[in-house]
Amino acid sequence: MVLSPADKTNVKTAWGKVGAHAGDYGAEALERMFLSFPTTKTYFPHFDLSHGSAQVKGHGKKVADALTNAVAHVDDMPNAQTALSDLHAHKLRVDPVNFKLLSHCLLVTLAAHHPAEFTPAVHASLDKFLASVSTVLTSKYR
């Protein structure tokens, strides 16, 4: 999915507002995903998935850091995310549909925390961006 210059600006601006809360938002999105889509828990059998667990917070920070990296390298995501793509495809073997589910939960989390900034245009741009990240992460599945 091609991001327009306006999409890139919207994504960078929106993610910039996330700032220091990125890890918290990542953890909240994971919790939403686990509650809304319980089958996603199967990839985390060794985690304490209770609200506020250190493991969920830690993984939420990893998710947020990966997205921060993707935002910083929005014009070269395939190269910037290659190691993460390899990890999810070859080692973790995550079902690609889970990236869509997490993306949806991230959008809900961002909208809940930044309702005034979450305009239809920003929503569309973030959705396209997360779809692009998902495409990159699933590119090594072939």
Curated annotation (Swiss-Prot):
Residues 2-142 form the Globin domain. It comes from the Eukaryota. Coiled coil: none annotated. GO terms for molecular function: haptoglobin binding; heme binding; iron ion binding; organic acid binding; oxygen binding; oxygen carrier activity; peroxidase activity. Red blood cells. Keywords: Heme, Iron, Metal-binding, Oxygen transport, Transport. Heme b binds at H88. InterPro entries: Globin (IPR000971), Globin-like_sf (IPR009050), Globin/Proto (IPR012292), Hemoglobin_a-typ (IPR002338), Hemoglobin_oxygen_transport (IPR050056), Hemoglobin_pi (IPR002339). Pfam families: Globin. The keyword Nucleotide-binding does not apply. The keyword Chaperone does not apply. GO terms for biological process: hydrogen peroxide catabolic process. GO terms for cellular component: blood microparticle; haptoglobin-hemoglobin complex; hemoglobin complex. O2 binds at H59. Belongs to the globin family. Heterotetramer of two alpha chains and two beta chains. PANTHER family: HEMOGLOBIN FAMILY MEMBER, HEMOGLOBIN SUBUNIT ALPHA. Involved in oxygen transport from the lung to the various peripheral tissues. This is Hemoglobin subunit alpha-2. The lineage of its organism: Eukaryota, Metazoa, Chordata, Craniata, Vertebrata.
